Amino acid sequence: MKGGKRVQPARPNRINREIRAQEVRLTGVDGEQIGIVSLNEALEKAEEAGVDLVEISPNAEPPVCRIMDYGKFLYEKSKSTKEQKEEQKVIQVKEIKFRPGTDDGDYQVKLRNLIRFLEDGDKAKITLRFRGPEMAHQQIGMEVLNPLRKDLCEDMDLAVVESFPTKIEGRQMIMVLAPKKKQ
């Protein structure tokens, strides 16, 4: 194994003695404005409070610094970004395949799955696959897709049609449904 120094990740904010400015605009622990003070005076106030002096806005003139517990600040920041990530939902496209001769029982099962996908907030891609002599009968494909569109978009008001096929593309017809936005 190779030995070496472990590189510390760069901190986004300078703290305490890392601050280079001679004068800083200081904000207290509770967010109150203290005013423009020398760096040494700001460091003394932070030390008295038992916390860190953190450079919040280094590009301001003079730089803005706040007296705060830096460890707690980083923890709160990482916690809030983690919560934001959890709240975001990645929309997936779920696919259900039909055939022109899909029977009513299979249709109902696939319809239930489509309803579940749309209620979960995912898009649904309905692929109607043709084989052999079925290619000549596009209207049979429409007889499968139109009831689906009617059931999901008009009767249940669950989805909006993003794309609806007008003709066979290759050996299949594809309809894409997106969930309706919840108020």
Curated annotation (Swiss-Prot):
UniProt keyword terms in alphabetical order: Cytoplasm, Initiation factor, Protein biosynthesis
Cell location: Cytoplasm
Site (Important for 30S binding): 107, 110
Molecular functions (GO terms): ribosome binding; translation initiation factor activity
Primary location: cytoplasm
GO cellular component, one term: membrane
Domain of life: Bacteria
Signal peptide positions (record): none
GO BP: ribosome disassembly
Stated family: Belongs to the IF-3 family.
Record function comment: IF-3 binds to the 30S ribosomal subunit and shifts the equilibrium between 70S ribosomes and their 50S and 30S subunits in favor of the free subunits, thus enhancing the availability of 30S subunits on which protein synthesis initiation begins.
Self-association and partners: Monomer.
HAMAP family: IF_3
Name used for this protein in its record: Translation initiation factor IF-3
